[in-house]
């Protein structure tokens, strides 16, 4: 388990905050060091066991997509290396899992795009025939491809709370009509381009979540992580079947285990603390992440 980093401890930079998976440090006034740890969250609860090398997989995958999609929208990348901003004895903590990025003003709306009906989208549809207020054709099945990708935003929740799906009208009310439309259109374009590429690698991107910020000139900028196995639902195309949940390349394996586990005979209530993950679940999840990276990018973990 020596390859796992549950929590970073960078003493040479001011800590700004720790999210579910990432630890953020200030680099001067205009940049951040983002360290992607091996923490795993499911149902908005951080689990107690790290998934070895998961942070490095996510980091490499996000960097791959930032470069691939840079022609669509500016992103937070800089040419400063993580190793150059920390003390020599801290380099091991950042190697392969950290980036130095532009400090942006975050837009507190998660830009979710769905190309398929799955997860909470499928539950919404079963109950109302809609997803996030968007009416869909009748008679769709679980995991079915939608006629066109849809933009289904969510309000960013406080740590430990569940993100809440909101309507596009609500997004307009929060950030203004022009910015809302731009964010929606760019998100759908990013999704379509990524999904078309992934299809050539035998992977379906069922849905994904983008995060944006504004730079000092008010320019919409892609940030955080992009199209990783944490922010997206990846399905292997060869085992895809409408009507059933395909085995995904992401946290679904852990989610399914958590849904099935019983504590004193009762289901886990999806609140902290999380039950301890068995060793085989940890290992299988680590393998899934690495497999997603290799299949999608053609690169091994560096």
From Swiss-Prot:
MF GO annotations: ATP binding; phosphoribosylaminoimidazolesuccinocarboxamide synthase activity
Any Gene Ontology CC annotation: cytoplasm
UniProt xrefs under SUPFAM superfamilies: SAICAR synthase-like
Entry keywords, A to Z: ATP-binding, Ligase, Nucleotide-binding, Purine biosynthesis
Family annotation (CDD domains): SAICAR_synt_Sc (cd01414)
GO BP annotations listed: 'de novo' IMP biosynthetic process
HAMAP family xrefs: SAICAR_synth
Protein name in UniProt: Phosphoribosylaminoimidazole-succinocarboxamide synthase
Originating species: Cupriavidus metallidurans (strain ATCC 43123 / DSM 2839 / NBRC 102507 / CH34)
Gene: purC
């Amino acid at each position: 388990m020596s390859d796992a980093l549950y929590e970073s401890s960078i003493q040479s930079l001011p800590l700004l905050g720790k999210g579910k998976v990432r630890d953020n440090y200030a680099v001067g006034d205009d940049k951040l060091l983002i360290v992607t740890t091996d923490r795993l969250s499911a149902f908005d609860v951080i689990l107690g066991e790290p998934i070895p090398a998961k942070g490095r997989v996510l980091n490499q995958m996000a960097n791959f997509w930032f470069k691939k999609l840079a022609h669509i929208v500016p992103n937070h990348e800089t040419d400063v290396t993580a190793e150059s901003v920390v003390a020599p004895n801290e380099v091991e903590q950042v190697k392969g899992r950290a980036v130095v990025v532009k400090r942006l003003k975050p837009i507190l709306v998660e830009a979710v795009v769905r190309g398929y009906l799955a997860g909470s989208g499928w539950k919404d549809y079963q109950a109302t025939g809609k997803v996030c207020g968007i009416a869909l054709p009748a008679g769709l099945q679980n995991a079915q491809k939608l006629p066109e990708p849809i933009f289904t935003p969510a309000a960013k929740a406080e740590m430990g709370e569940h993100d809440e799906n909101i309507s596009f009208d609500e997004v307009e009310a929060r950030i203004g009509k022009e910015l809302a439309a731009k964010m929606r259109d760019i998100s759908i374009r990013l999704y379509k381009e990524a999904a078309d590429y992934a299809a050539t690698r035998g992977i379906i991107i069922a849905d994904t979540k983008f995060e944006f910020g504004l730079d000092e000139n008010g320019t919409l900028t892609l940030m955080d992580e992009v199209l990783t196995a944490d922010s997206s639902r990846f399905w292997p195309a060869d085992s895809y079947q409408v009507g059933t949940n395909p085995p995904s390349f992401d946290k679904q394996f852990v989610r399914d285990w958590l849904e099935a586990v019983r504590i004193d005979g009762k289901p886990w209530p999806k609140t902290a603390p999380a039950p301890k993950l068995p060793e085989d679940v940890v290992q299988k999840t680590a393998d899934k992440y690495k497999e997603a990276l290799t299949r999608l990018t053609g690169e091994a973990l560096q």
